[in-house]
Swiss-Prot record:
It is found in: Cytoplasm. InterPro entries: UreF (IPR002639), UreF_sf (IPR038277). This is Urease accessory protein UreF 2. Belongs to the UreF family. It holds the Pfam family UreF. GO terms for cellular component: cytoplasm. UreD, UreF and UreG form a complex that acts as a GTP-hydrolysis-dependent molecular chaperone, activating the urease apoprotein by helping to assemble the nickel containing metallocenter of UreC. The UreE protein probably delivers the nickel. HAMAP family: UreF. One of its GO terms (molecular function) is nickel cation binding. It comes from the Bacteria. Keywords: Chaperone, Cytoplasm, Nickel insertion. PANTHER family: UREASE ACCESSORY PROTEIN F. It comes from Brucella suis (strain ATCC 23445 / NCTC 10510).
Amino acid sequence: MTMRTATITEFSSSYRSLPGLLHLLQFGDSALPIGGFSFSNGLESAIQQNLVHDKETLREFTLTAMNQAATSDGIALLTAHRAARADDRGALQVIDKAVFERKLNEETRLMTVRMGRKLCELSASIIDDRLNRDWLECIKTAETPGTHPVSLGLAFVALDVDGRDAFGAQQYGVATTILGAALRLMRVSFMDTQKILLEATSTVAPAYEEIADAGIEDMASFAPMVDILAAVHVKGHVRMFMN
């Protein structure tokens, strides 16, 4: 039997990629303390209106939400990632405002700026990076809204995570936010949500290829049902989630 001996170069390459993988796990974790657990991405209203009522409709809702996020926040994340690499502060502010303006209802605007600010506060505290610290000051002084995809892009650039992997973490976060909320809102098992998650993650690579070279002008957030559900949720009498 022939034993293959790994070269020093192969080990070095493996070690170089490991920190990036761990950073993805940390910042893609739904338990990251930026308030994501307070939001359901519209699922609560969808369940109340009986649009989501079983594992199949939950699957459809999750895949639709991920697709919508890819062409809106996903593009914003990638353009912010490129701008941060170039240290283009002006472009970052343009992207940030474009994201905020495309959130048509109060709850989605609240979600993106609350999570964006919390993420930037976290990044500025634990990552030694001037751009993240400066961006936090811009948020505090109301120079920029501080949306979540822009803050996420800045954090991943500081951690030397590439755009494709950053997009993957963002998409994973959308799916786990919805599926985590589903476990608290409806009769569905962990097996069901994990099966949906496994299928959902298989759509991320093709979604990335479709928007990899998109610019901020290509952002599209056409999702009328989500906006209607958010409007219904604002006036809801019984609410577990903030959106």
